[in-house]
Design a protein with these regions (language model features):
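Short, surface-exposed loop/helix-turn segments at secondary-structure junctions
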Residues: 21-24, 64-65, 91-111
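Short helix-loop capping/hinge segments that flank enzyme active sites or metal/cofactor-binding pockets
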Residues: 4-6, 23-74, 78, 123-134
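Gly/Ser-rich, acidic/histidine-flanked active-site/gating loops
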Residues: 1-20, 57
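Short low-complexity, flexible loop/linker segments enriched in glycine and/or proline
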Residues: 15, 19-25, 104, 135-137
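Small-aliphatic-rich amphipathic alpha-helix that forms the alpha element of a beta-alpha
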Residues: 76-78, 103-123
Length: 159
């Protein structure tokens, strides 16, 4: 299809960023919902309440340390992306759940969200139950147009 593919090994700092993603996400969620958590706890959806309950123990120091790891990981990923046009990864570990209660398991895109790198989902095939399964094109921070172009290329190649 006009592309060469190779496997890449990510530096340990990128793996560490993936591990600390929840610190950033949960701390920021707790900050964003602080008023609701304090004033309207019982009116909040149960899943959100549980997540906010689980995030109460993170401190500002935990958050800042995690942000330092994320910044180092973004720099390391930028170094890798100097040698390749795009990273290609699965969008999720399986088919999405049925219904609208959840978008599914986010673990395959949470790193890119943390690092602020563009990632574009491309439907790869339709699984049983008419549920989509996708891949994602990931490019360097700020290279949004490149991610969109790569997604278009992948979409054409998968037709």
């Amino acid at each position: 299809a006009g592309a060469s593919v190779r496997e890449l090994k990510m530096p340990e700092i990128v793996a560490e960023a993936w591990r600390i993603h929840n610190v950033v996400q949960q701390f920021e969620a707790h900050q964003a919902f602080a008023w609701e958590y304090g004033e309207n706890y019982d009116a909040m959806p149960p899943l959100l309440r549980r997540r906010l309950d689980d995030s109460r123990h993170y401190t500002a120091a935990d958050y800042e340390a995690a942000r330092v790891v994320a910044a180092k990981a973004r720099a390391a990923l930028s170094d890798i992306l100097r040698d390749v046009d795009v990273l290609l990864a699965l969008s999720a570990p399986g088919v999405p759940p049925k219904g609208l209660d959840s978008t599914g398991d986010p673990r395959f895109n949470q790193l890119w969200t943390l690092l602020g790198t563009p990632c574009v989902n491309v439907p790869a095939y339709v699984a049983e139950g008419n549920l989509p399964v996708g891949v994602q094109a990931i490019t360097d921070y700020g290279a949004d147009a490149k991610a969109i172009a790569a997604a278009r290329f992948i979409e054409r190649a998968l037709r």
